[in-house]
Structures are given as structure tokens and as C-alpha cells.
């Protein structure tokens, strides 16, 4: 398994257990699911109608996003102006690190990142923002949105802002 760790905060943000797709050469997107957690009843796949139960969320359980829950991501809020301030600083930091470690990737990063940020700004109200578990304000924001079907959530992380660790 490969764990993707934020190069600034050291927080684990995603793994290859989720189906990753590279977008614009700079973003990993992964579809998520909403799952039930908590409560004492463990779902073992029994027939709910025969067990006198339904598919409702029981008391003591909570419906959560599996990626957000698994990696203990913390929701945060931005307005457009504060997001742009954050993303400019973050992109500058990643570009500086790339110039030292992999200068050939700088132009790919700049072009792809600019295109993806425009996409986020264009549909800003649809996005949710998360930080890693440490809540480091300089660390990467994990972006969450829904696919065109309106029901499938996905997360997005910056390829150049993570290091892949095989465990």
C-alpha cells in the first residue's frame, strides 16, 4: 500500500486503497463513499429484512465520508478571498521545493495548478476544504466536491505536495 503524506505537515492524506486518477498532471482525485461508523452493531452483511432491521442509520452511528474519517481530516472554511491568499502562498512554497528537488516538473506544476485553481474558483461554493490531522495552516488543503452525478464525493490533493511512502 502507498500512503500519500503532506510534505509540509507530515500528515497522511490519502492512500492507493482508493482509486486515484491524475488530473492536469498535478492533482490526484479519488472517489469516496459515505459510510456508517459507531454504534455497537457491526454490519456483517446479514439479510436486514430477516434480521428485523432496515438500511437506516441506527442510533449511535454516524454517516461519514470514508476518506475524511480514515485520515482524520479536519474541516475548515474559506471564503474566495482567503482561499486565494492561502493557495498563492502554498503554490509558492511547493514551487520552491520543486525547483530544488525536481526542476523539470516546475512548468508542469505551474500550468496544471493554475488550471485546477481556476476550476475550483469557478465552482467555489460547491467545494469543501479539509486540513490534515495536525491542522497545520501551512499544510495542504484537501479539496472535496461531488462528481457530475451529484452523489459521488471525491477528494483532490496536489501531486507535488505529497510524498508517496510504500508501507
Swiss-Prot record:
Disulfide bonds: none annotated. The keyword Transcription does not apply. One of its GO terms (cellular component) is cytoplasm. Keywords: Cytoplasm, Cytoskeleton, Microtubule, Protein biosynthesis. It comes from Kluyveromyces lactis (strain ATCC 8585 / CBS 2359 / DSM 70799 / NBRC 1267 / NRRL Y-1140 / WM37). It is found in: Cytoplasm, Cytoskeleton. Belongs to the TCTP family. This is Translationally-controlled tumor protein homolog. It comes from the Eukaryota. One of its GO terms (biological process) is translation. InterPro entries: Mss4-like_sf, Mss4/transl-control_tumour, TCTP, Translation_control_tumour_CS, Translational_control_tumour_p. Involved in protein synthesis. Involved in microtubule stabilization. The keyword Cytoplasm applies.
Amino acid at each position: 500500500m502507498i500512503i500519500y503524506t503532506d510534505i509540509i505537515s507530515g500528515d497522511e492524506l490519502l492512500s492507493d486503497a482508493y482509486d486515484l486518477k491524475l488530473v492536469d498532471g498535478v492533482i490526484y482525485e479519488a472517489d469516496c463513499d459515505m459510510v456508517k461508523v459507531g454504534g455497537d452493531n457491526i454490519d456483517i452483511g446479514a439479510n436486514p429484512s430477516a434480521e428485523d432491521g432496515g438500511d437506516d442509520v441506527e442510533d449511535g452511528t454516524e454517516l461519514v465520508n470514508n476518506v475524511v474519517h480514515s485520515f482524520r481530516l479536519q474541516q475548515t472554511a474559506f471564503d474566495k478571498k482567503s482561499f486565494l491568499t492561502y493557495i498563492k502562498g502554498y503554490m509558492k512554497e511547493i514551487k520552491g521545493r520543486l525547483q530544488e528537488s525536481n526542476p523539470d516538473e516546475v512548468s508542469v506544476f505551474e500550468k496544471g495548478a493554475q488550471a485546477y485553481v481556476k476550476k475550483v474558483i469557478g465552482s467555489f461554493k460547491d467545494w469543501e476544504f479539509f486540513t490534515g490531522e495536525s491542522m497545520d495552516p501551512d499544510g495542504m488543503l484537501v479539496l472535496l466536491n461531488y462528481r457530475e452525478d451529484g452523489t459521488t464525493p471525491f477528494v483532490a490533493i496536489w501531486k507535488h505536495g505529497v510524498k508517496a511512502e510504500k508501507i
